[in-house]
């Protein structure tokens, strides 16, 4: 299957949450998510108990490789751009990957309305947009309110991981994450990654440009 074989499920003016062709669509500027989110869970996750999630999945190379590596874990790929969702979907279909689900929408909307408490065993954010200009920083993913959502969604002892090429973004994210999660690494709580992180398109892009890759992990402590 080619990416363009995945058709949009609705026109913008008719937007609504739906599951179609293995993709959960959670549109922005829609105000009745709660009416759908109570019923989708069984259809989409089918009683899987070991669940991991990647945010900012891009073209899907990394998450597809993870799903192939461990078929006992259900992976969720969250990506807001439909052109990229199409590419993830095409890889999922062509490789016949049964343990991968795709969410087309923002991470914030998906977590607020569709992710239950203590649901995830692992959450990975790969190369999120750092929004480097000061006036744009309100658009960053790892805002304090979303870090709280992350903590809520993780099981006790679950791991959160972040990979980025932007050191300023890394350090500010570490500060935000410490309000709800505990670092797994010693000070300064991150490492520089010299080896390939896992065939991410963005990782390959930044390495070809000579960028350093930074990686950090946090853990959800019991009772938080």
Curated annotation (Swiss-Prot):
Highest taxon of the lineage: Bacteria
Residue numbers annotated as active site: 129
Gene Ontology MF term list: tRNA (guanine(46)-N7)-methyltransferase activity
Enzyme class: transferase
Entry keyword annotation includes Transcription regulation: no
Keyword flag Methyltransferase: yes
InterPro entries on file: SAM-dependent_MTases_sf, tRNA_(Gua-N-7)_MeTrfase_Trmb, tRNA_methyltr_TrmB_bact
Binding site for S-adenosyl-L-methionine: 54, 79, 129
Pathway involvement of the protein, from the record: tRNA modification; N(7)-methylguanine-tRNA biosynthesis
Any one cellular-component term (Gene Ontology): tRNA methyltransferase complex
Binding site for substrate: 133, 165
Protein family per UniProt: Belongs to the class I-like SAM-binding methyltransferase superfamily. TrmB family.
Protein name: tRNA (guanine-N(7)-)-methyltransferase
Species: Chlamydia pneumoniae (Chlamydophila pneumoniae)
The organism's taxonomic lineage, starting at the top: Bacteria, Pseudomonadati, Chlamydiota, Chlamydiia, Chlamydiales
Gene: trmB
